[in-house]
């Protein structure tokens, strides 16, 4: 796989946006003619663009032009001349349609990405890896490691094991730091820059399953606060560990060159943990921090403590690593870790079909549903009836004992 990025003011941006839309039309015609529809079949092997993820790099000034219903200038790469002018709204509509039609292109918000860049003295961030979680300098890399959040969640008491999670984040930060020395890289340049910056890739998976088990709607203020606090704990603890390693081993080679930039980014992370909107530095768009109104107090305290430590130790010792965390889709390793959901994603279905080794399928309920119903205070008898209904109808709509009004108030929408 590869990531292909194009700046939004590139003269060929419209062709790029519509590239896969047109290729998918060819696939549809071939399938209609009788070719197999599987992604490794002849239809998909015949068309272009199937080995890449495409993204457009969108700067903040485009959205200002969009709000004003203005014209967007497409610039020559060689000398910056305006080659063509298009309506910003028309271009944005095409991007949205293409993403809906064939899932490409994605959007990468160039201004925001570079405002959170820890090492701008090394150059701008121009692209990402194929899954778009790792954003750093050209020709750098990081090794990934993800933690299964469900393993830290006490389903009976609806509590997250903060101490265990912090220990795991510390341990894996050290492991990933060691991996910088042990990893094999595809080129000398990638190897050298990876040694110079020592970027790491600690993340997590199974957030959607953990939220479902706890009885909290994925698209809710409570879920966003919990996810934000857990992410803040992970990243804060990881940078704290990086600073502790720097005290003994020294900071990464390019740290002094980027010291003030990196410390500013660290302070902005701390401001987000405290939801201190006035404390952000050098940001055109200020992010939503952790909302204390919706976040469990023990998670919020752990998040702010982690970032206080990360900033204080970083100011004293620097950091061993230019970046420490990313949240990957975990598509393959998530299966090995027994995750019901990947990365930060919600579960895709309440009812699933399990393929049998001897052939055939049987229908199973999402394994998070029974415990979610228990945490929502349904009795075992009610739980059994709801589960059996869902397996038979593939939906909870119309199920016995389900109060759709109260579920709607909690953020669960009809499905």
Model-found features: residue ranges?
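Long, C-terminal-biased catalytic regions of enzyme "large/alpha" subunits
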Residues: 1-415
């Amino acid at each position: 796989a590869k990531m292909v990025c194009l700046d939004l003011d590139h003269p060929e941006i419209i062709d790029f946006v519509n590239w896969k839309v047109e290729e998918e039309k060819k696939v549809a015609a071939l399938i209609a003619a009788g070719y197999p529809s599987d992604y490794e079949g002849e239809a998909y092997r015949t068309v272009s663009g199937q080995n890449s993820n495409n993204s457009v790099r969108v700067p903040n000034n485009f959205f200002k032009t969009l709000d004003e219903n203005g014209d967007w200038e497409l610039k020559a790469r060689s000398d910056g001349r305006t080659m063509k002018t298009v309506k910003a709204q028309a271009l944005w509509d095409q991007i949205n349609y293409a993403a809906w039609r064939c899932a490409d292109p994605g959007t990468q918000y160039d201004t925001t990405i570079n405002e959170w860049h820890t090492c701008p003295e090394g150059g701008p961030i121009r692209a990402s890896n194929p899954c778009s979680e790792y954003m750093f300098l050209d020709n750098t890399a990081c090794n990934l490691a993800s933690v299964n959040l469900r393993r830290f969640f006490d389903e009976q008491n609806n509590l997250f094991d903060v101490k265990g999670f912090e220990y795991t984040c510390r341990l894996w930060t050290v492991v990933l730091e060691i991996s910088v020395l042990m990893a094999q890289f595809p080129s000398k340049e990638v190897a050298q820059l990876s040694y110079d910056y020592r970027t790491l890739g600690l993340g997590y998976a199974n957030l959607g399953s953990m939220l479902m088990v706890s009885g909290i709607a994925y698209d809710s203020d409570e879920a966003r606060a919990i996810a934000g606090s857990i992410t803040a704990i992970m990243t804060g603890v990881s940078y704290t560990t990086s600073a502790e390693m720097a005290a003994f081993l020294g900071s990464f080679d390019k740290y002094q060159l980027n010291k003030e930039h990196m410390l500013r980014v660290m302070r902005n992370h701390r401001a987000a943990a405290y939801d201190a909107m006035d404390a952000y530095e050098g940001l055109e768009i200020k992010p939503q921090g952790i909302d204390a109104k919706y976040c469990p107090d023990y998670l919020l305290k752990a998040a702010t403590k982690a970032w206080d430590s990360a900033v204080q130790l970083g100011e004293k010792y620097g950091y061993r690593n230019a970046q420490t965390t990313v949240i990957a889709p975990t598509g393959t390793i998530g299966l090995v870790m027994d995750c019901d959901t990947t990365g930060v994603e919600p579960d895709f279905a309440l009812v699933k079909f399990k393929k049998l080794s001897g052939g055939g399928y049987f229908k199973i309920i999402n394994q998070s549903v029974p415990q979610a119903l228990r945490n929502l205070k349904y009795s075992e008898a009610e739980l059994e009836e709801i589960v059996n209904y869902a397996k038979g109808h593939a939906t909870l709509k119309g199920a016995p004992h389900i109060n759709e009004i109260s579920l709607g108030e909690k953020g669960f929408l009809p499905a």
